[in-house]
Amino acid sequence: MKNTKQAIALASAAALSVGMLAGCGGAASSAATASSESNSTATAEASTTAASDGTLVLAETGFESKFSPFFAASAADQDVIDLTQIALLGADRKGEMVLNGIEGETREYNGTDYTYHGPADCVVTENADGTVTYDIKLREDLKFSDGEPVTIDDVIFSMYVFLDPTYDGSVTMYSTPIVGLDEYRSSMTTLSKLIAEAGEDNTDNTNFTAEQQKAFWDAVNDGGVKFAQEIIDYCVENGAAADANDAAGAASAWNLGELPAGATAKDMFELIGANYDWNFSSMEAETAGSKLSDLIPEDVYAYSTTGVNVGDAVASVAGIVKTGDYSMTLTTTELSTTMIYQLQMPIAPLHYYGDESLYDYDNNSFGFVKGDLSGVRAKTSAPMGAGMFTFSKYSDGVVYLDANPSYYDGAPKVAHVNMKETQEADKITGVQAGTIDISDPSYSLEVADQIADINGAEGEDGPVITTRLKDYRGYGYIALSAKNVNVGGDPSSQASKDLRKAIMT
């Protein structure tokens, strides 16, 4: 902990701390130590050992304990992943991709030159037939934190996880036009989708058993109906539906789509399922209270991540080709503005997240059985990667990280990082008290005044707290409580709706 100035960031703690955590060679994807007085890039010899002591404490909000490079969902969990993993390609301070990471690229930002290094080079070639080829070459000195080398097999394994038909994490590489990807994914679907689309009265059990069908529809009729009814009840309470039987009105208000008059809660749940291809994890986004995973049996919930071959099986993606131990090509059917950004994907260790006995590139086996990511999903409590820091433990709301001496761009200057789950009310006072080094409170005029008061009326930058404001790409809205703003105590009446509309316009 520092005893003098602390820093408070109005952005993600990990994002602000990258430069502070980097070794002399720089940060994960923006490696530089720049002179503040000239446009020349300062150079320094990268250290191979971390600082002998020193702990940086970062305030975080809302750990979900899904510390996986494939399935992290919350911002706090993703911050842990960002510090323990390396991305195949990185970006500069303007968000532009760095394609020559091995030798590095020097780019100007706000009058200062910065040199960016990364794990790989990428050459993009637009071909005469309209296809686009990405030639990727890895550095040959990369190591995971356990000392194992990073090779192109780890990259290919990671890609196939992201492209698996049952993958339901936040990375959307499966939406890119990679040659052969549609055929690879469409040759398999999920068990939940098959049963749902067959219907409750189905008698053809070619792809699933009668017992599985019954278990699925029992879950829909019980937990699924309860899940949908909570949405309807919420809409009624807030004046967006007429009564507890108004599934059609609630579906419209919830932006689920149209249902006919007289539709039921079960109809609403089936509409939600269709909207999300019957992926129960994705359907959780529509909750009005309860988790769907708490309402339906665990084995049925797993149907949405269980792959079933339909038609002729396609074992590999034609556009992904290994060309060497440290090189590969990826080909798309057309120029895609998003493809290059998808290559910011983490390089996860095959030997840790996958099954090495199931990796045989020449025989279309990529570290797991297609359609079965259960082994990958099981590794969420302790991430492993080749990033700046190694995961030590998660205990009592704190993630403990240690400097990775094998980090390719030099060991971090800070020996330890503690990522501490912190309530919003404590994000400023924690910095003031010295229990937190870097925080990210929600900004407001009241917060600005509080910081200025702590700094002795010296403003947002003072002897106690240093503030850095970061642009936040988001949106805000103003909401009215239908329970409080209505006519005659009837939130759902047309007069009440007209009143709220008049106030907002």
Residue ranges and their predicted role:
Residues 1-11:
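Bacterial Sec-dependent N-terminal signal peptides
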Residues 3-4, 136-168, 224, 306-308, ...:
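Extracytoplasmic/periplasmic ligand-capture domains
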Residues 16-20:
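Hydrophobic core
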Residues 21-35:
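Bacterial lipoprotein signal-peptidase II cleavage site
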Residues 59-129, 384:
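N-terminal lobe/hinge region of extracytoplasmic solute-binding protein
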Residues 64-71, 90, 96-99, 145-146, ...:
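Short, solvent-exposed loop/turn elements at domain surfaces
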Residues 93-96, 277, 281-318, 324-327, ...:
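Gly/Pro-rich hinge or "lid" segments in bacterial periplasmic/extracellular proteins
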Residues 113, 120-292, 329, 430, ...:
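Aromatic- and charge-enriched surface segment that lines or borders ligand/interaction sites
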